[in-house]
Amino acid sequence: MSQTDASCTIAELPYRSVTDLVVLDFPRPEVALITLNRPGRMNSMALDLMKSLKQVLKRITYDHSVRVVVLTGAGRGFCSGADQKFTAPVPQVEGLTQPVRALRAMELLEEVILALRRLHQPVIAAINGPAIGGGLCLALAADVRVASTRAYFRAAGINNGLSASELGLSYLLPRAVGSSRAFEIMLSGRDVGAEEAEQIGLVSYRVSDDRLLDTCYSIAARMATFSRSGTELTKRALWGGLDAASLDKHMQSESLAQLFIALHTSNFEEAAAPCTEKRPTVLVDARGCATSPG
């Protein structure tokens, strides 16, 4: 598939009928690139864009040709959070009062955060610029974060006279950087630059702008070499570990996941075979099959 064939807006795909506010590319085999595409507003979280993103995520989780998803923003920003100058109508709120309309708007944003977490595929956030307010929340909902040198992060609710706690930020940020740093970042409303973000574990890597997507594609390509069930269950276990009430309960769920793969596939035996048979590993996520991985 050529680059021209592989790159298209969602609206051009008959089974993904949404707007060009979200652009879908397939830049590498088994890798999907989702780009927030309102660069003039630094990809702010207006409801029309978020509705489109939700629709894309809903579709792509069942696209079995995609093993890893990369999420980024067009232009100079990743996502600038709430847009105080541009608003879009709240969908499906006819006849509701203004307070209920506001609740529905927040529900839509919350559903996007949860959709990223629940996506079958791992999600890598390629943070190409500022991730502010809800944009920081969006980045934290990804499984892996890579930042360009021009990226920075801000829990902006506190700067806007509101609470810094929004869209799961007070849950996700302490788990990413620790409670003390999360308290300080959220209560101060200061900017966290890309270098500091890498130092405190907010992002895995800080790279130059021109290397950002290639770095993410390299990570994605490695992830895609492993079994689909192993990757999906590892993602579930990691998020489940953040929610776990105790080590004991979480170890039980991990053990069940390992047994599920061991009993229903030949992956474990296949992983050892190439050492003696001198051939590439072929993980098929099934027992007794000789087909290629899927």
UniProtKB/Swiss-Prot annotation:
Q: What keywords appear on the UniProt entry?
A: Fatty acid metabolism, Lipid metabolism, Lyase
For this chain, the family text in UniProt reads:
Belongs to the enoyl-CoA hydratase/isomerase family.
The EC category is lyase
Q: Supply the Pfam families for this chain.
A: ECH_1
Which PROSITE patterns does the record cross-reference, listed alphabetically? ENOYL_COA_HYDRATASE (PS00166)
Functionally, this protein is described as follows:
Could possibly oxidize fatty acids using specific components.
Q: Which PANTHER family match?
A: ENOYL-COA HYDRATASE ECHA12-RELATED (PTHR11941:SF130), ENOYL-COA HYDRATASE-RELATED (PTHR11941)
Q: Which GO terms describe its biological process?
A: fatty acid beta-oxidation
User: Does the keyword Ribonucleoprotein feature in the UniProt annotation?
Assistant: no
The species this protein belongs to is Mycobacterium leprae (strain TN)
EC numbers:
4.2.1.17
Q: Which GO terms describe its molecular function?
A: enoyl-CoA hydratase activity
Q: Which reaction does it catalyse?
A: a (3S)-3-hydroxyacyl-CoA = a (2E)-enoyl-CoA + H2O; a 4-saturated-(3S)-3-hydroxyacyl-CoA = a (3E)-enoyl-CoA + H2O
The gene name reads echA12
Q: Does the keyword Lipid metabolism apply?
A: yes
Protein's recorded name? Probable enoyl-CoA hydratase echA12
